[in-house]
Amino acid sequence: MKDRTQELRTAKDSDDDDDVTVTVDRDRFMDEFFEQVEEIRGFIDKIAENVEEVKRKHSAILASPNPDEKTKEELEELMSDIKKTANKVRSKLKSIEQSIEQEEGLNRSSADLRIRKTQHSTLSRKFVEVMSEYNATQSDYRERCKGRIQRQLEITGRTTTSEELEDMLESGNPAIFASGIIMDSSISKQALSEIETRHSEIIKLETSIRELHDMFMDMAMLVESQGEMIDRIEYNVEHAVDYVERAVSDTKKAVKYQSKARRKKIMIIICCVILGIIIASTIGGIFG
């Protein structure tokens, strides 16, 4: 009979090599994944820093009736940078999401997959938080610009309600603000100049908000769905804890009852033994 020991040993060594290769490939994949996570986190931090700088630019522009062009250009550059970086983050998060969905579609489940899902969820939430802050900053700036326009209109003797002013802004026509204003004083001219400046800022702002709206809603819906999933997990965990606690309690009761039953059984055996001794002694006395 042919000795196949060497052949089997070679096959085993080959299998071991395959296992090592798979492990190394998986480790390399996770290393690359964590590098990507750090890159995304860096992008999100950059957006957060830019949002704070945008707030400072807003304050500087509002502090001056006619802000210098340099400040306005710097604000536009910041807004453009936020948009570009946000699109990068969204693209990378989408790529991770698709990779996770593919593995889930193949019914694969591993510690690595759970880690990736957790990291993706954390980054998505952080991204939505910083973009929510940016959106709130833009909305606040719009309201402040709107307030300045309303005050300048009052200076010219024209009173408007908030709804009327909103209609004027939505028209997108700067000339509508000059309607009914008597341009016979430098005060009226200066007021109209600031109105036009603020209106121009609002138009740029609304364009930026529209550009980011779809992306923001897409990510917000993703995070909301993740939140529902996390809530379900927490619910299941809480109920699992309750179940375990009840099981422990029931086990303690069972042990207690079992202990009592065992003691009763021992007492019965002892009584039987004693009774047997008494009967044996009695019979012995009779026949003795």
UniProtKB/Swiss-Prot annotation:
- Which residue ranges does the record annotate as region Disordered? 1-20
Major localization class: membrane
What ranges does the Extracellular topological domain annotation cover? 287-288
TM ranges = 266-286
- Where do Basic and acidic residues bias regions lie? 1-13
Does the keyword Glycoprotein belong to this entry? Answer: no
Q: Which residues form the t-SNARE coiled-coil homology domain?
A: 192-254
Kindly provide the PTM information from the record: Phosphorylated by CK2. Phosphorylation at Ser-188 by DAPK1 significantly decreases its interaction with STXBP1. Sumoylated, sumoylation is required for regulation of synaptic vesicle endocytosis.
- Kindly give the SUPFAM superfamilies that the UniProt entry links to this protein: t-snare proteins
Taken from the record's topology, the Cytoplasmic segments are: 1-265
User: Which subcellular locations apply to this protein?
Assistant: Cytoplasmic vesicle, Secretory vesicle, Synaptic vesicle membrane; Synapse, Synaptosome; Cell membrane
Q: Which residues carry this modification: Phosphoserine?
A: 14, 64, 95, 188
Which of UniProt's keywords are assigned here? Cell membrane, Coiled coil, Cytoplasmic vesicle, Exocytosis, Isopeptide bond, Membrane, Neurotransmitter transport, Phosphoprotein, Synapse, Synaptosome, Transmembrane, Transmembrane helix, Transport, Ubl conjugation
Output the Gene Ontology cellular-component terms. acrosomal vesicle; actomyosin; axon; glutamatergic synapse; membrane; neuron projection; nuclear membrane; plasma membrane
- Swiss-Prot/TrEMBL GO biological process terms: calcium-ion regulated exocytosis; hormone secretion; insulin secretion; intracellular protein transport; positive regulation of calcium ion-dependent exocytosis; positive regulation of catecholamine secretion; positive regulation of excitatory postsynaptic potential; positive regulation of neurotransmitter secretion
Phenotype upon knockout? Mutant mice show impaired glucose tolerance without any marked hyperglycemia.
Q: Which family does it belong to?
A: Belongs to the syntaxin family.
Q: Spell out the protein name for this chain.
A: Syntaxin-1A
High-level lineage: Eukaryota, Metazoa, Chordata, Craniata, Vertebrata
Which gene carries the instructions for this protein? Stx1a
